[in-house]
Amino acid sequence: LSDEVLEKAEQVLQTASQAIQAADWNQMNLIANRMLDQEMSEEQMSRATELFQIIDLAIFYRTAITDSISKLEIGNDFEVTRDFRVIVVEKSPEQLVVRYNAKNKTYTIDELPWALAHQLARFEVAGDTFSTAAKSVYQFIAPKTNDGLRDEALEWIREIQSDLDGTDKENIESTLKSLFSEKE
């Protein structure tokens, strides 16, 4: 492979890394398939596969949340956690308005409280190991996360006992850690 091809591949990998670090969902979607179609070295392809898995899991989970919101009916209520229910007041592809404690609360997708985001995703995906991995990756990279939530997400990944359909859980953890140590 020429230096030019390798440099272009490196730029694509850098763009993918930056999209993940910024939780830029649109950019992640755009770059994911382009990344795997890009000609690159074996080492670069290995990195591309790792980044693709992170993007795939995160987008899968975020899509579960947005699909769940799209299926909610105005006026319906549901349990977020034990003894905590919300009523759906309004919804759009970008936000959800729920009522609890006699107040309306408006959230964009990225601002949803974790308990609410995870409950919405559960409406769409079963509690299998793939969805646990997706939940972990989403919580790790989402804009409103913090170090404690990242540690919790890594713990969920470590607790996965079965195969992830070709996705190596150790690779997920090491890729996430390397991406976010680069960022800091």
Q: Can you annotate each of these PLM segments?
A:
Residues 1-184:
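Compositionally biased alpha-helical segments
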